Amino acid sequence: MSVLRSQPPSVVPLHLTTSTSRKTEQEPSLLHSAIIERHQDRSVPNSNSNPDSNHRIKKDRNNHTSYHSSSNSESNMESPRLSDGESSTPTSIEELNPTINNSRLVKRNYSISIDPLHDNSNNNTDDDHPNTITSPRPNSTSNKEMQKYSFPEGKESKKITTPSLNSNNCLDLDNSSLVHTDSYIQDLNDDHILLNKRVSRRSSRISAVTATSTTIKQRRNTQDSNLPNIPFHASKHSQILPMDDSDVIKLANGDTSMKPNSATKISHSMTSLPLHPLPQPSQKSKQYHMISKSTTSLPPENDHYYQHSRGTNHNHAANAAAVNNNTTTTTAATGLKRSESATAEIKKMRQSLLHKREMKRKRKTFLVDDDRVLIGNKVSEGHVNFIIAYNMLTGIRVAVSRCSGIMKPLTPADFRFTKKLAFDYHGNELTPSSQYAFKFKDYCPEVFRELRALFGLDPADYLVSLTSKYILSELNSPGKSGSFFYYSRDYKYIIKTIHHSEHIHLRKHIQEYYNHVRDNPNTLICQFYGLHRVKMPISFQNKIKHRKIYFLVMNNLFPPHLDIHITYDLKGSTWGRFTNLDKERLAKDRSYRPVMKDLNWLEEGQKIKFGPLKKKTFLTQLKKDVELLAKLNTMDYSLLIGIHDINKAKEDDLQLADTASIEEQPQTQGPIRTGTGTVVRHFFREFEGGIRASDQFNNDVDLIYYVGIIDFLTNYSVMKKLETFWRSLRHDTKLVSAIPPRDYANRFYEFIEDSVDPLPQKKTQSSYRDDPNQKNYKD
């Protein structure tokens, strides 16, 4: 009596699953039904009753051949189920056990699938009673029995090989090393694909005795919930070939005699998959393996599937042809729409990219490298003054950020209010942690907040410009004050260290300064944005002269994106007000731009070229500013003038931002709008942050002036009075700088008034000229 070993519930013998990987309820396995009906009355003997048969089964198990697909073998080599030393198994039907080649041929429809053989449904089967069923097949089968397994639909049924019987009439179905996975079995002699569901090598640690299998009835009842969803991988499914238009037409006409050939396979191979021509089947055998009807493993983008429909009824072929025709039409229309939309999208992206490149090209060239410093020395980590600069920026960031409530009308107390912040390594509720320990003091925060709003500054932009990167550029003061200048990253703002006396003078007159700025939006006085103090730890007492450092944040009068060709600092005095030029360096070094003074201005016959309208506006505003400074008991201030020559810039072939479009800009611009309200456009900052020169007919010329009153924090103190008395003993009081504030204001205004003329001035040898041989006095 033949013995057929049962399989575990997840084992599918490949010999019986070459047709399809799963079966629908409408197509029950007739072959399985025949086997079960014929052997229902067969008893299941004990494994001990036939030791020879068990011995042969164990022997065959040692020599079994696995039908693991190449793709799945590669993917499971790293799986913990594979023990060390195991390798992948053959992937084609031709590599099966040689005994299979002598098996009988069974004709059947390609749509018929064979389920696993019946097993005891009891999962708690004892190890002493392995699940076995007997095989009913003798070596010679009658014609009646053969008719049960043949299904003559169509012209010719495909033939597949079935496992052969051994000498004891036992069917060799021991494939315990195979379990279900989502994969394929590919025959190298044909282009047919076997869907083997889940195929991989079982772990050797799992005993075949403890494995159980489900009955055919259970298999049929649970097949809908066990439908595999096989993902598509190009490396595993490289030979899945779609149907072309000719195949669709044949299906529509009811022609089911399509035969695969190498030419069709090569021409239909997907471009994204590797192309491997498959060998032709033997002409003698003419045995073709059928392709499964399952389409769950194909990619969702493919609308056509390569199918062999021998043995398929005409109704099914007609339905498939109709679906394929509709799909082809829809795919063609969708592909055309996708092509047009893709072209439009690519064109839009190209235009956007070109626009971004153009905007980047128009940006300021000095900001290309964020770490580059154009003016002065770079103050970054490692610099001797980096700790001071770091503390300044950290204090400004915290103080300005906290001063962001609702703006209220200022009171007299706001002009005397100060706010202290203590920074340490750990931080607290008021201040964040800092890299260094220091104390920060903010003077009149609400007043300077109002001033920043009057000057049209946005708080966020203000903080970003100063504290976006803790990198500043340091510039020593060209004057005698000894102050340090730190430029922000975008060169819009300047941090200037001041003396304690200057800090006291500003705090004393901050209310007058605020009222003047509010009433005179076109004022020439320098714009102050904040007054602060940094107190360093006592450990810095030996490194710096003073532990307390007072500093101001003010505007940079000159634009960072334009070259200032010549600069003048005019006070109205002539004693020591001359700058010796290094002509050789001036010719070689284009960055050498010394600040010229009053005597240089007079020798060169320079004039501020303003027409009648601009001259009147300029002198009117200058008079108001000078009156305020005289009222505040201030002296030693000066008018800083920077001149940008448009023609010279073109001749030098300088790449200046928007310089070529200056002539096309209107003479006046509308008011600018900030978060706090409308701010009137500054009259003297209309063109690139400056004012355009004009002739006697009020026509613009190719010069841009940047003018402003600076250094107006010097109080006429007792020391200045003593200096005035000392200088008057040897020089005329009209020539020296240290004179009373009222006299200083009048002389200053008269000198500037004489310098404003649209016509060039003639060179004169006046009493302003100092003796060149005399030692210059640094004013």
UniProtKB/Swiss-Prot annotation:
Q: How does it sit in the membrane?
A: Peripheral membrane protein
Using the UniProt record, name the top-level EC class of this enzyme in a single word. transferase
- Asked if the Swiss-Prot or TrEMBL record annotates the protein with the keyword Zinc-finger, the reply is no
The organism's place on the tree of life at top rank: Eukaryota
**Localization per Swiss-Prot or TrEMBL:** Cell membrane
Query: Where is region (Required for interaction with OPY1) located?
Result: 2-346
Positions of the UniProt region annotated as Disordered: 1-100, 116-166, 759-779
Where composition is biased (Basic and acidic residues), the residues are 768-779
A single GO BP term for this record reads: cortical actin cytoskeleton organization
Question: Keywords in UniProt for this one?
Answer: ATP-binding, Cell membrane, Kinase, Membrane, Nucleotide-binding, Phosphoprotein, Transferase
- The PTM Phosphoserine maps to 207, 225, 661
Q: Where is the composition biased (Polar residues)?
A: 85-100, 131-144
| Cellular component, GO, one term | nucleus
The catalytic activity of this protein is classed by the Enzyme Commission as 2.7.1.68
User: Which residues are modified to Phosphothreonine?
Assistant: 222, 659
Entry's Gene Ontology molecular function annotations: 1-phosphatidylinositol-4-phosphate 5-kinase activity; ATP binding; phosphatidylinositol-3-phosphate binding; phosphatidylinositol-4-phosphate binding
User: What is the protein's name according to its record?
Assistant: Phosphatidylinositol 4-phosphate 5-kinase MSS4
Provenance organism: Saccharomyces cerevisiae (strain ATCC 204508 / S288c) (Baker's yeast)
